[in-house]
């Protein structure tokens, strides 16, 4: 029973699907995908439930969400184990994600009050009131790299505002989605308020096509996000929020400070989660000259020592595998393509068992036209530069705009960088993947269109209703011209 529709666990009636551990190819979950007809049933159930759910007080909705938070805390180790088995991420990392699933709920509750609560004031004998109302039925598309807390950052704000949800997890991580749904069930969520539909492309297309949707919250690849954007063109009545990827630049100044700390920051930026974070550094700009050479030598030496292993291995690895063998092949093919264009591998990424790929670094300085692609894995491209102005110009040469960073102890360099760089998340002397939990997450260009994560998700889950109110109608002292009573 892999689908949760209208408060019932039902079997999918579509194609068989499995979840395979990418580190040993063991099947850890299996079921059948939802058909388009089942997706329509899920949307209809959400539509019916919306009429009741939106009428509950905020306190009543909040109580159920807080019950869910407690269930997450009680089951945090099992959540971490499931995510590790489905994604291959080290258990220390998935434990952090399980903690974030519960931790970000408090952010969403605060955001509801601060961004979409109710306010009133008196002006010229009128009561001016601002209220917020839910949109209706929201589709949430979850990613595989953070299958627990990223969907939660959409689902929780949607529910708090009074919306109902149809949730489609990534087909790579159905087990995590199913387990989270069971925790919502245990928390006392009424039937139909969240509906779970599992499946791959056909299920996703059916959900995006459903006529009963009022909004879509999507986290995933730029390619899929652009398809959704075209699909929703001409439908201004539907809210579409896209969180997509990036071809993220990291610029290292001559004034980078401590070399070991800089190397550590680069590794954390490029290879955390085996490079499978949308904010990971993809392009590293290093100054020409002796200092840059020495830094690269240190980076190469440290990269060769990175421990890559199964999620539960001891001693603990820094990196696990790619999400699938297809994803691993994509990284190796990208490396081969860059080599054919003139790139020189400083550390060659190599295939291991199952979906393992070791981290790779390739000097792409001599590539005439660097492909503007997101290589979603542990492949870092290095480009040498002559001046900070040139580095920033090269860094901005991308259709994406998610994250960027500068490593420099020089305040004037930082002022120039932050004034000229084009990105939504811009860090100084910190890893590119770091961001505050209540910061707007996203960027311009092909990286997305809104910032619908955790705190700022509140903006996209409710619409403002402005009212001017009086206790009774009134006659003015002077009528408008042309009116007689």
Curated annotation (Swiss-Prot):
Give the EC number(s) under which this enzyme is classified.
Answer: 1.2.1.71
UniProt keyword annotations, A-Z = Arginine metabolism, NAD, Oxidoreductase
Catalytic activity as recorded in UniProt: N-succinyl-L-glutamate 5-semialdehyde + NAD(+) + H2O = N-succinyl-L-glutamate + NADH + 2 H(+)
Please name the GO terms of the biological process aspect recorded for this protein, alphabetically: arginine catabolic process to glutamate; arginine catabolic process to succinate
Residues at the catalytic site: 243, 278
| GO molecular-function terms, A-Z | succinylglutamate-semialdehyde dehydrogenase activity
According to the record, the signal peptide region is none
Give the stretches traversing the membrane. Answer: none
Its pathway, per UniProt, is:
Amino-acid degradation; L-arginine degradation via AST pathway; L-glutamate and succinate from L-arginine: step 4/5
List the SUPFAM superfamilies hit by this protein, alphabetically.
ALDH-like
> In this record, what's one Pfam family?
Aldedh
Q: Which InterPro entries match?
A: Ald_DH/histidinol_DH (IPR016161), Ald_DH_C (IPR016163), Ald_DH_CS_CYS (IPR016160), Ald_DH_CS_GLU (IPR029510), Ald_DH_N (IPR016162), Aldehyde_DH_dom (IPR015590), SuccinylGlu_semiald_DH_AstD (IPR017649)
Q: Which superkingdom is the protein from?
A: Bacteria
The entry's family comment says:
Belongs to the aldehyde dehydrogenase family. AstD subfamily.
- Could you tell me what this protein does? Catalyzes the NAD-dependent reduction of succinylglutamate semialdehyde into succinylglutamate.
Q: What is this protein called?
A: N-succinylglutamate 5-semialdehyde dehydrogenase
Q: Which organism is it from?
A: Vibrio atlanticus (strain LGP32)
